[in-house]
């Protein structure tokens, strides 16, 4: 299982020998083998497959924006979105960087197209490279365009969807399913102008309050 998890292929002879001897049940030996395997070129598969499954990047393209709409630039950067996440994850793994960089880093990986259309920074060439961010609010995984796109519907964004995404995929504390008798939003929205105001009304409903007090702040943080 360790080999297929890290290499997406069969174990080598060294790992087989240790497994037959029952030595992989020893935490120290397991750690040694994990570190050894991550240095092997085969571990590049882990650098691709793990973040893509973890962050649900297979859902990219499920609801693409209108090419003529305000998010039409998506189609010019689409091919770089998943590779950007993979490059960031693999670099953090290879350098044994601090885990907080997943959430807050002062750098990212970009090329000319991503720099021009997403980050508003000048970068030369098509190759993704490690670049210090001029706006550090764009650091980490959560603000990468791949994640922003996965948590949108092609027309607009949703703080609820993004809040649930953070709770499920980053914090590992998914909220329970909403009660079956709760409407998506309160029918009485007179005088309400913004989505934030609509959701505030929703949170005032007793059946919604406990979950949305956790969901909504997470989602709002990704809306600015």
Q: Could you say what each language-model-derived stretch is?
A:
Residues 21-22, 205:
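Non-catalytic regulatory/linker segments of enzymes
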Residues 115, 130-224:
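Sequence context surrounding c-type heme c attachment/ligation sites in exported
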Residues 6, 20, 28-165, 176:
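A cross-family structural signal marking well-folded subdomains
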């Amino acid at each position: 299982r360790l080999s297929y998890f890290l290499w997406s292929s069969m174990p080598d002879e060294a790992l087989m020998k240790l497994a037959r001897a029952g030595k992989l049940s020893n935490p120290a030996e397991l750690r040694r083998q994990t570190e050894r395997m991550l240095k092997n070129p085969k571990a590049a598969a882990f650098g691709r497959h793990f973040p893509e499954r973890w962050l649900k990047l297979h859902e990219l393209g499920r609801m693409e924006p209108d090419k003529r709409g305000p998010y039409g630039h998506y189609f010019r950067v689409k091919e770089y979105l998943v590779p950007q996440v993979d490059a960031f994850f693999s670099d953090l793994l290879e350098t044994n960087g601090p885990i907080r960089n997943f959430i807050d880093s002062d750098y990212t990986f970009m090329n000319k197209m991503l720099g021009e259309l997403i980050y508003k920074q000048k970068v030369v060439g098509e190759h993704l490279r490690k670049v210090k961010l001029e706006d550090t609010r764009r650091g980490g995984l959560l603000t990468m365009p791949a994640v922003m796109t996965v948590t949108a519907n092609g027309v607009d964004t949703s703080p609820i969807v993004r809040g649930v995404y953070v709770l499920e995929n980053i914090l590992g504390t998914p909220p329970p399913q909403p009660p079956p008798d709760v409407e998506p939003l309160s029918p009485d929205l007179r005088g309400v102008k913004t989505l934030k105001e609509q959701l505030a009304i929703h949170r005032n409903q007793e059946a919604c309050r406990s979950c949305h007090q956790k969901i909504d702040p997470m989602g709002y943080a990704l809306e600015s």
